[in-house]
Amino acid sequence: MEPAVLAAHHLPHHEPISFGIDQILSGPEPPGGGLGPGQSGQSHGESAAFSSGFHGASGYAPAGSLASLPRGSGVGPGGVIRVPAHRPLPVPPPSGAAPAVPGPSGLGGAGGLAGLTFPWMDSGRRFAKDRLTAALSPFSGTRRIGHPYQNRTPPKRKKPRTSFSRSQVLELERRFLRQKYLASAERAALAKALRMTDAQVKTWFQNRRTKWRRQTAEEREAERHRAGRLLLHLQQDALPRPLRPPLPPDPLCLHNSSLFALQNLQPWAEDNKVASVSGLASVV
């Protein structure tokens, strides 16, 4: 059966009202939005009857009634309940208790009003939680995925470079010139003599051999370049130089001994000079 029908059966009998619609329309408007005490009482009585009838039919009684509400719980004069702008969210029942069936007005007793939550309360809590998370995010250990500076592994801290005294370096260099590789016993004896550890002597000799190999390779490369340049210079010197072809003998010089001797003394003379000499000989 419908709840409205059940509520209609359980409506109590009220006294007839002392005024009608004509009196309301003709008379002045009473304060409180046009609702008189009789109308407020009637609506309150109908809602109470509806709530009691509904709960009676369902077999469940609410935790409290309107009569048990305190004065500061939003109940106005005449039993009118002040409903907030936002409809409250239903409070989940405790574990082990029977599920509460909300009434038509959506309000319970004083205990229900104390545990009501509104949407603006949840938004405020979420806002405070977000602000707290944002404030603690720089100090949290979690790293953002995809950030290049936070995903890369931190660089390893380099060990401080060991510095040796001048006397130790001179003795090590002198020993290296004589012997490039040391046996374990020789290395231990040298480390003890120089007041160094075996690992320090071993590392120094390894680094010195690497440097020696690099210097030897560079020196060999320089010698190879010098030898190539020297060979190229020798080849250029060994090549025969092109000789100037001899000048054809002048027929006048063949018959004149002085001109012939002059031509032989100047083999570098050009053709024009030879021609000039020939002209002079003809003049003589």
Swiss-Prot record:
Major location category of this protein: nucleus
Start-end of Pro residues biased regions: 87-96
Keywords: Activator, Developmental protein, DNA-binding, Homeobox, Nucleus, Transcription, Transcription regulation
Record-level GO BP terms: enteric nervous system development; mesoderm formation; negative regulation of dendrite morphogenesis; regulation of transcription by RNA polymerase II
Disruption phenotype: Mice are born at the expected Mendelian ratio and show no visible phenotype at birth. After weaning, about 43% of the mice exhibit distended abdomens and growth retardation, the others remain symptomless. About 36% of the mice die between 3 and 6 weeks after birth. Affected mice display distended proximal colons and cecums. Both affected and asymptotic mice have increased numbers of myenteric neurons in ganglia in the proximal and distal colon with a concomitant increase in myenteric ganglion size.
Functional description taken from the UniProt entry: Transcription activator that binds DNA elements with the consensus sequence 5'-CGGTAATTGG-3'. Binds DNA via its homeobox. Required for normal cell death of enteric neurons in the gastrointestinal tract. Required for normal development of the enteric nervous system, and for proper development of normal motility of the gastrointestinal tract.
Classification via PANTHER family: IP01054P (PTHR45921), T-CELL LEUKEMIA HOMEOBOX PROTEIN 2 (PTHR45921:SF3)
The protein, known as: T-cell leukemia homeobox protein 2
Organism in which the protein naturally occurs: Mus musculus (Mouse)
